[in-house]
Amino acid sequence: MVLLAMGLVIYLATSKYGNIRLGEGKPEYSTLSWLFMFICAGLGSSTLYWGVAEWAYYYQTPGLNIAPRSQQALEFSVPYSFFHWGISAWATYTLASLIMAYHFHVRKNKGLSLSGIIAAITGVRPQGPWGKLVDLMFLIATVGALTISLVVTAATFTRGLSALTGLPDNFTVQAFVILLSGGIFCLSSWIGINNGLQRLSKMVGWGAFLLPLLVLIVGPTEFITNSIINAIGLTTQNFLQMSLFTDPLGDGSFTRNWTVFYWLWWISYTPGVAMFVTRVSRGRKIKEVIWGLILGSTVGCWFFFGVMESYAIHQFINGVINVPQVLETLGGETAVQQVLMSLPAGKLFLAAYLGVMIIFLASHMDAVAYTMAATSTRNLQEGDDPDRGLRLFWCVVITLIPLSILFTGASLETMKTTVVLTALPFLVILLVKVGGFIRWLKQDYADIPAHQVEHYLPQTPVEALEKTPVLPAGTVFKGDN
């Protein structure tokens, strides 16, 4: 499914359909702000954790039947991060986003919700039992996916805060961190996208760029650069094998625990990301959305992961920090803290990292709250936003539910299993949406010459009905008897 999504969006970007404009008028946001909001909507703050520590998991339990803890396992650890956070994942987001944006901005269908688009494609009533079930599944899956980001972020943040200030690393401090972040994104949600989320996303985007840039400058620059180039080469060379690796001669644990989990995690987020991308992409062309999401977001992820993981690997192979051992004995949060503290002016780097993390968490939860409020709003039209009170309600909900899960002490594996189970129905839903999208494109643009596509707006069924003349009663047509 992920490979099919990638193939389809690349075809759309390079064909005449790429020039279809999603709504009338000029884009509402600058390209940079637009890309930053993509990143905040599509990535959780736990990205900052995985961006430092994920390679160590792959080093200990690698894919492709590579020997654990070998030189080859170390060499493939960064490429696997690039693979899981790269083009395939963002292509899935892109496809779902294009379908929703076309439904809302081109076809002018009402309702920025999953049930709304399913209703437009299949004819089921969005307020009927099937429509309500679809929206309920979306809300449950979104909370489940968000929980992993929030719990991992809280644990990483409090471990780093403890190293900086001496505060205890316990549930009370973790709860305070979550509530603090909740307060920030509640305020941002109340202010609105233009003055709230847009500003937070800019702070996150610049912070997530400047932090690894400084690490690249003050760290082992040559090693990091060579590591990134090598990882890009290995990812490109082995992309198809990584995508289709099922481990038929082994137990399949790597594929199941990592690749399948990641694909389903991304898929569980697709409805929410699609709603948010639709909201901020009015006036953009289809190919702009495709290249912005696939290339812009992938390059951003690869730069952060490439620099931070390569620095951690350098510290490991030079005997400064045994990151895999720390990961096993003290946990990934401690491994992240020790890697950052090993930098020159390590405390400043750790403080900056934690600052970016808390703002990242707030901006991501703000975007999620917006999509959940949009799902709960009937007949939302182009240019409208969900009610502020409804947005605040969902802000509170997505703060308290993960907080309760954190209190129970659920393991990461348990949360990953929950994500997999709740995401499975969205595979079917995504296939239904893809079928409807292809049908719409054929109906609306198949006969339109390529040079006219950009300025052509198809007539919606509602517009066609409004333009149908209403004849007086008793009108007799020629040939009637």
Swiss-Prot record:
Its main location: membrane. It is found in: Cell inner membrane. Keywords: Cell inner membrane, Cell membrane, Membrane, Transmembrane, Transmembrane helix, Transport. GO terms for molecular function: transmembrane transporter activity. The keyword Repeat does not apply. It is a multi-pass membrane protein. PROSITE patterns: BCCT (PS01303). The chain crosses the membrane at residues 32-52, 82-102, 137-157, 173-193, 204-224, 258-278, 289-309, 348-368, 392-412, 418-438. It comes from the Bacteria. The keyword DNA repair does not apply. GO terms for cellular component: plasma membrane. Probable transporter whose substrate is unknown. Is not involved in aerobic D-malate transport. Belongs to the BCCT transporter (TC 2.A.15) family. This is Uncharacterized transporter YeaV. The gene is yeaV.
